């Protein structure tokens, strides 16, 4: 199991990144909440990781903190929750927000996540309640501290990256395009476009 990687951020292509560790490039998929906290390309980066081995692929998921990684592991233990749905949940809501939903048994925020209907949300909250008794909603301690932002990407590229990232989370292409097109400030980075689009959808 690969539990942590430390190296240099070589590339960002939401929701994936390439982490260069001593010349070896690891492709890592991250939730949007981690993506927002990434440093600039070329800067050092440490990720807490979870490796999924399948017959046809080995998939590496990365998180800004051990707490996020552990939360992801709790989610994928649930019946019917795979890595894709777990990342969609963690991309739409911060860990503390998800914990509060569990504590309050509040389905409203969860049902806005792609792939989560009311019945699924209710089942997830019931299953999570006992597991998360030890999870208090406390201020998150993230390992990543944003450095100076990268130079703004070309508008068309940033919009395209944002749309692709939303589609990867399970949103329909039309929904993703509409959410990104609704953003008035076209000079934003792809990360900021994704953040605003998700806020508009949740």
Curated annotation (Swiss-Prot):
SUPFAM superfamilies: DNA helicase RuvA subunit, C-terminal domain, Nucleic acid-binding proteins, RuvA domain 2-like
Region (Domain I): 1-64
Ranges that cross the membrane: none
Main location: cytoplasm
UniProt keyword terms in alphabetical order: Cytoplasm, DNA damage, DNA recombination, DNA repair, DNA-binding
Region (Flexible linker): 144-154
CDD domains: UBA_RuvA_C
GO biological process terms, semicolon-separated: DNA recombination; DNA repair
Compartment(s): Cytoplasm
Location of the region described as Domain III in the Swiss-Prot/TrEMBL record: 154-202
Molecular function as annotated in GO: ATP binding; four-way junction DNA binding; four-way junction helicase activity
UniProt-annotated stretches for the region Domain II: 65-143
Keyword presence, Membrane: no
Family as reported in the entry's similarity comment: Belongs to the RuvA family.
NCBIfam families: ruvA
Protein name per UniProt: Holliday junction branch migration complex subunit RuvA
Organism listed in the record: Pseudomonas fluorescens (strain ATCC BAA-477 / NRRL B-23932 / Pf-5)
């Amino acid at each position: 199991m690969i539990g942590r990687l430390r190296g240099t951020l070589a590339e960002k292509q939401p929701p994936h990144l390439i982490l260069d560790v001593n010349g070896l490039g690891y492709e890592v998929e991250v939730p949007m909440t981690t993506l927002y906290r990434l440093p600039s390309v070329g800067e050092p980066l440490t990720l807490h990781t979870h490796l999924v081995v399948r017959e046809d692929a080995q998939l590496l998921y990365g998180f800004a903190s051990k707490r996020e990684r552990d939360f992801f592991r709790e989610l994928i233990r649930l019946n019917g929750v795979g890595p894709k749905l777990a990342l969609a949940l963690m991309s739409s809501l911060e860990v503390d927000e998800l914990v509060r939903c569990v504590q309050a048994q509040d389905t409203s925020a969860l049902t806005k996540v792609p792939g989560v209907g009311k019945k699924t949300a209710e089942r997830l909250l019931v299953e999570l309640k006992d597991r998360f008794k030890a999870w208090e909603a406390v201020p998150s301690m993230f390992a990543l501290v944003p450095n100076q932002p990268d130079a703004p990407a070309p508008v068309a590229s940033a919009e395209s990256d944002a749309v692709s990232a939303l589609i990867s989370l399970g949103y329909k292409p039309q929904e993703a395009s509409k959410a990104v097109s609704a953003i008035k400030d076209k000079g934003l980075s792809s990360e900021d476009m994704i953040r605003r689009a998700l806020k508009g959808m949740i």
